[in-house]
């Protein structure tokens, strides 16, 4: 209800980026699960797959019927209009599918100013925002024109990371990258927080790293209390689509639900601080 009030007062979508500069942190799966849950909870959402590999699109296609858009994502960016690049998955859920043609984007924007290049997606999303409650962007795990575009177009960034040494050290670099773009082009950008992704739940090293992560961010409370643990169920869903009636379905789904609701709670808190 509180979220509904905030969305009504904004009259336009809240844009969330799900991103980190490292693959294998469960990023696209998190986006897929959020798409599934937003649909389930009657939020009107546009998912944007700004990834050449189109991982999110392929994953969503296992659960929803995904058709090809009239105009692919790259052509939409090139033409300056994304309306024809949107496909409808359900009454609530829309998608701009990823396409390998996105690899042509750096060539298209090569002669542009850095500002115009970085603002491209933000500019083209502006007229679509009033149609949705949330817009969730999934993009490549590397510094690139794709990521810059996504960061500049977003209100919030959510950072999935593996609870292991290496990831925690890279956090600072990633945050500096965000701050750099925020200061130049997107002063309203905020971090929702880090979602820990555990590959091996029994490893003592990972447990101590996770504790360390919570300790480091005790003051700013940036680490989600709810975490994602790797599960075979998710691999099954990636093959056959998301189900809710088979063994362990509910348990794994509720793990994602908890993260989803914590994300919404954090957004509500941040939005209220702005008012």
What residues fall within each predicted segment?
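P-loop NTP-binding core
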Residues: 1-275
């Amino acid at each position: 209800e509180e979220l509904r009030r905030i969305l009504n007062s904004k009259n336009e979508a809240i844009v969330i980026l799900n991103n980190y500069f490292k693959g294998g942190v469960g990023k696209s799966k998190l986006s897929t699960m959020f798409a599934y849950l937003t649909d389930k909870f009657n939020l009107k959402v546009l998912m944007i797959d700004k990834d050449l590999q189109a991982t999110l699109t392929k994953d969503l296609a296992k659960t929803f019927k995904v058709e090809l858009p009239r105009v692919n994502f790259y052509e939409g960016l090139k033409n300056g209009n994304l309306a024809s690049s949107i496909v409808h998955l359900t009454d609530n859920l829309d998608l701009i599918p990823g396409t390998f043609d996105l690899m042509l984007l750096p060539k298209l924007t090569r002669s542009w100013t850095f500002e115009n290049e970085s603002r491209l997606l933000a500019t083209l999303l502006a007229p679509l925002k009033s149609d949705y409650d949330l817009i969730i962007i999934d993009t490549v795990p590397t510094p690139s024109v794709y990521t810059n575009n996504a960061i500049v177009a977003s209100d919030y960034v959510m950072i999935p990371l593996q609870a292991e040494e290496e990831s925690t050290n890279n956090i600072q670099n990633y945050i500096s990258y965000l701050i750099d773009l925020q200061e130049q082009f997107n002063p309203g950008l905020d971090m929702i927080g880090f979602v820990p992704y555990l590959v091996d739940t029994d490893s003592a090293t990972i447990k101590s790293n996770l504790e360390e992560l919570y300790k480091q961010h005790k003051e700013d409370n940036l680490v989600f209390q709810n975490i994602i643990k790797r599960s075979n169920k998710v691999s099954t869903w990636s093959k056959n689509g998301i189900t809710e009636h088979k063994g362990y379905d509910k348990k794994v789904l509720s793990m994602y639900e908890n993260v989803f609701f914590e994300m919404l709670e954090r957004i509500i808190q941040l939005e209220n601080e702005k008012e």
